Amino acid sequence: MDIAPYKKPEYFRNRELSWVSFDERVLNEARDKSIPLFERLKFISITSSNLDEFYMVRVASLKDQVHANYTKKDLSGMDAKEQLAGISKRTHELVQLQYNTYNRSAVPSLEHVGLTIISEHEKLTKEQAEYVDSYFEENIYPVLTPMAMDSARPFPLIRNKTLNIGALVQKKEDSLLSRAEDKKEKKGKEKEKEKELEFATVQVPSVLPRFILLPQDEKTGQRYVILLEEIIERNIGKLFLSYDVVCAH
């Protein structure tokens, strides 16, 4: 029996794109409203963690092949560059669908059962802001380690599968003047005044819960939660006392 015809590329599916299809099916479970709400949220989380692992292992391997100029095609007839292009297109669509599912389905459903997620710290009420600032001082600040980058300090090592906040900071004017006077560099004083942007990172600690529960609204009975990184972003200026924080995300 001649099996050669069955080796045609059209008879095979690319392994990596097949995996993306699997993750799409997982996300479809999160879109099924017959499934309990918190189970649907778990499926969104699983989709995200699967995608992280996929990029860390499989996509990294394909990029290594491209860098090594390895051009052999797989059984589906795709080389590494073609696979990466296909993966990029499909995963962009997957992530967009993931965010749509979370924002348009999961979040409204949570609000309907009395739990509101505050997505931006600017939306906090005065009482909530006071609570999260106190929580930051007591629980978050002691476990944070900000890292800056400049000509003397290379880009900091960021661990896999960690959440980090990036910030652009500038030396405060009074600090620049003080530094110039201490060095007695009168001729270069104007140059010292020039503010240069510096990049800094803050790793969101994994030892703390990602979602922080805020006090219940006594009038409506509604409960509120805010993301840990939003609290850090709100208070990030406390980590760089000699700097102005231009932006942080």
Predicted regions and their residues:
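Extended, highly charged clamp/arch subdomains and adjacent linkers
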Residues: A4-F12, L17-E39, D52-H249
